[in-house]
Amino acid sequence: MNNLILVRHGMSLWNKAKRFTGWADIDLTEHGKSEAKYAGKLIKELNIEIHSCFTSELKRAINSLNIILKILSNQNNNINKSWKLNERHYGELTGLNKDEIIKKHGHKQVNIWRRSFDVSPPPMNTNHPCKNKICKNIPKEKMVVTESLKDTYERVIPYYNNKIEPL
């Protein structure tokens, strides 16, 4: 029987600043690196052999995985990176402070954007100041400007079913 271990990336610079991150390719904080080390130590205590790793194309996720693998002394060459595992795209909210957005639009509206299954945040404008921070490894025809949780589900689940679950 195979095990599936899910680990969220460590704290990023924008997590710390309470900014919507989504597809913006933002680095880990030192605390985030420590969180990844701690996750690696917990996995090591379980004495589970890692055969395959999957990560998004976002450097905070890739760096978290690399830190974990270093703790495990695992020179795993079977690392699969895919933009299809990226976090949800927060559209126009990307890079904005969550508290400021709540003040501007109200807690109820922000919760609708964040928690509704089929409601997307406003789409990212072509002149958005964070446009250049969006992950670059996405085929142009697949690039979106916002995602609902449903959109994210419809992107991630087929990847899981085709690439991860068969292992």
Language-model segments: residues:
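Short glycine- and Lys/Arg-enriched binding-loop motifs that mark or flank ligand-binding interfaces
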Residues: 6, 18, 28, 87, ...
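Loop-to-helix element that buttresses phosphate recognition and phosphoryl-transfer chemistry
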Residues: 11-67, 142-158
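Active-site-adjacent alpha-helix immediately C-terminal to a catalytic or transition-state-stabilizing loop
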Residues: 4, 62-63, 70-76, 150-167
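Long, compositionally biased
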Residues: 129-140
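Short, hydrophobic/glycine-enriched beta-strand segments
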Residues: 3-9
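Phosphate-coordination/substrate-recognition cap region in phosphate-metabolizing enzymes
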Residues: 38-131, 145
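Short acidic/His/Gly/Ser-rich catalytic and metal-binding motifs that mark active-site loops
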Residues: 12-17, 122-124, 133
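Short coil/turn segments at beta-strand junctions that form active-site/ligand-binding loops
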Residues: 2, 48-51, 166-167
